[in-house]
A protein has these predicted regions:
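Acidic carboxylate diad motif detector
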Residues: 1-20
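Positively charged, helix-rich recognition surfaces that bind polyanionic ligands
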Residues: 15-248
Length: 248
């Protein structure tokens, strides 16, 4: 793709950097390029109803539209969690080797391959989900999560990092521009999980342990699904006119 853009004069490079990572060589190019994927910005075959995406630890993402229909649920790969046994063995083998020895270099390479596999699995899931959203949906609302702040919580730091919510948000942002997806970012203080998607009441007693949302109005719904529906309706709520005072 880069070669074709260079031949067509749609890309002008001005810098390049080379690095070695996980026993592979990587070349990063910097330049000025024309708009990509202009031919794919079509609304044909897309969901026309506004959609919302709730990102989390148990489920990486739940996508639902404003009408309450769940469009997709993606479970996290938990690559780091599943690799803990292999990582412990590789770290132990590395610690037993001598500094500067061939064995240490081989042990470091094995350890690097495990970390590379974890990162690749996480990145692959985020790429697939962001591509689906950018090419299937018309309008998507996601929360403006403070991922860096969330990783400061000792009880959730590893799970949040393993989920890759930051990578998913970044990919959604640039692929939305590529494929013509209209994306909105709801305020991080918007109570999407605590608000009932049926009656609009807010359950201030809801905790992270409550995976099912139960409302006195009779609604019983998965917490993530309820949040995704509320996010799908957020653009209308955020632009709604404030109530006028009653006439004296």
């Amino acid at each position: 793709r880069v070669r074709r853009m260079l031949e067509q004069g749609r890309l002008h490079l001005f810098a390049a950097s080379i690095r070695r990572e996980h026993e592979r060589w990587w070349v990063s190019l910097q330049g000025v390029a024309a708009v990509c994927h202009t031919a794919r910005r079509s609304s044909k075959g897309r969901h026309t109803v506004q959609a919302g995406m709730d990102r989390g630890v148990k489920s990486l993402a739940v996508v639902a539209n404003a009408e309450g229909v769940v469009l997709r649920t993606v479970e996290g790969v938990n690559a780091l969690k599943h690799a803990q046994v292999a990582l412990r063995r590789a770290n132990k083998a590395y610690s037993r080797t001598k500094i500067g020895s061939v064995g240490r270099r081989k042990a470091a390479a094995r350890l690097g391959r495990i970390h590379a596999r974890v990162a690749n699995l996480r990145r692959n899931t985020a790429h697939q989900l962001s591509y689906w959203a950018a090419t299937t949906l018309t309008t998507l609302t996601v929360e403006d999560l403070n991922v860096a702040g969330m990783t400061q919580l000792r009880t959730l730091a590893r799970s949040i990092s393993d989920a890759g919510m930051g990578d998913l948000g970044r990919m959604l942002s640039y692929k939305a521009g590529w494929y013509g997806l209209e994306i909105h970012h709801a305020d991080r203080w918007f109570p999407s999980s605590k608000t009932c998607s049926a009656c609009g009441s807010i359950n201030t007693d809801l905790t992270l342990a409550d995976r099912v949302y139960r409302c006195p109005c009779g609604l019983v719904l998965g917490r993530d699904v309820n949040a995704a529906i509320n996010l799908a309706r957020w653009p209308e709520l955020s632009t709604a006119s404030p109530p006028r005072p009653a006439a004296a």
